[in-house]
């Protein structure tokens, strides 16, 4: 399911954002050869015809996921991506990781959920006046614990279970996240620069992954496509805003346990 007019990205938008500038030629990954137009001043130039086609396919894909009330996890922990990842994922009502990827965020979801429950418990205590009844030292310790957990898990605390896809800015930087997703059979959408390895990425979007203007364009476009998908679903339902069905955590646990079980 998708909107009749899903979000589209145009060649001129990518050019203006500098999405065609790759890395220095000496740092290239040969697997990205098919997506490279040429080189200028020892900098690889990405063929944006490939980028436009791949990006719009990815936008149509996430648009359809959102229309079916599925979840797309936004991942971008480096400086150029973290701010816009948190902002746009929140705008689209999607989970995100913007601080640091903790090993096992997907493959060890059952255990990680305990930390999420602890975060929610501390947030409740902060709101209901429990902290005010503690000694200053105890209140400070709990506040610090809450802030630490919020930095690491705040973006996924309401995810409810494993995502249906992940969108990654800089696939090399987020290699652990991609590996976990692939182990669980979760589709990966990735911005892949000329120095990166496109292996294990289901939707390869060849583009610059460092320029803040370009990264902002990518992430905002993804969020727009998701919002459009949600709005289309509501229109199809007669304009009634249906509550999203929470993912069954039992199903998520079963999925992670199945992936962790070695084949006989």
UniProtKB/Swiss-Prot annotation:
Gene3D superfamilies: Glucose-6-phosphate isomerase like protein, domain 1 (3.40.50.10490), Helix hairpin bin (1.10.287.610). GO terms for molecular function: structural constituent of ribosome. GO terms for cellular component: cytosolic small ribosomal subunit. GO terms for biological process: translation. PROSITE patterns: RIBOSOMAL_S2_1 (PS00962), RIBOSOMAL_S2_2 (PS00963). The keyword Secreted does not apply. Transmembrane segments: none annotated. SUPFAM superfamilies: Ribosomal protein S2. It comes from the Bacteria. Keywords: Ribonucleoprotein, Ribosomal protein. Residues 233-264 are annotated as: Disordered. Signal peptide: none annotated. InterPro entries: Ribosomal_uS2 (IPR001865), Ribosomal_uS2_bac/mit/plastid (IPR005706), Ribosomal_uS2_CS (IPR018130), Ribosomal_uS2_flav_dom_sf (IPR023591). Belongs to the universal ribosomal protein uS2 family. This is Small ribosomal subunit protein uS2. It comes from Psychrobacter arcticus (strain DSM 17307 / VKM B-2377 / 273-4). The lineage of its organism: Bacteria, Pseudomonadati, Pseudomonadota, Gammaproteobacteria, Moraxellales.
């Amino acid at each position: 399911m998708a909107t009749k007019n899903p979000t589209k990205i145009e060649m001129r938008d990518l050019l203006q954002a500098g999405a065609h500038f790759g890395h220095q030629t000496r740092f290239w990954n040969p697997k990205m050869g098919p997506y490279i137009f040429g080189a200028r001043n020892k900098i690889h130039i990405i063929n944006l015809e490939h980028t436009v086609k791949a990006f719009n396919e990815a936008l149509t894909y996430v648009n359809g996921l959102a229309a079916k009330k599925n979840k797309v996890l936004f991942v971008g922990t480096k400086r150029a991506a973290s701010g816009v990842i948190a902002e746009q994922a929140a705008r689209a009502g999607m989970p995100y990781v913007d601080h640091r990827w903790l090993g096992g965020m997907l493959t060890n979801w059952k255990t990680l959920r305990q930390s999420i429950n602890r975060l929610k418990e501390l947030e409740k205590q902060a709101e209901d006046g429990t902290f005010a009844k503690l000694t200053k030292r105890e209140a400070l310790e709990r506040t610090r614990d809450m802030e630490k957990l919020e930095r690491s898990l705040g973006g996924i605390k309401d995810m409810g279970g494993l995502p249906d896809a992940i969108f990654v800015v800089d696939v090399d930087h987020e290699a652990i996240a991609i590996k976990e997703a692939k182990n669980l059979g979760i589709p990966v959408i990735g911005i892949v620069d000329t120095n990166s390895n496109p292996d294990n990425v289901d939707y390869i979007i060849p583009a610059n992954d460092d320029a803040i203007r370009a990264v902002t364009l990518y992430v905002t476009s993804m969020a727009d496509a998701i919002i459009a998908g949600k709005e289309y679903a509501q229109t199809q339902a007669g304009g009634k805003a249906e509550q999203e069905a929470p993912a069954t955590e039992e199903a998520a646990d079963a999925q992670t346990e199945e992936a962790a079980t070695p084949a006989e």
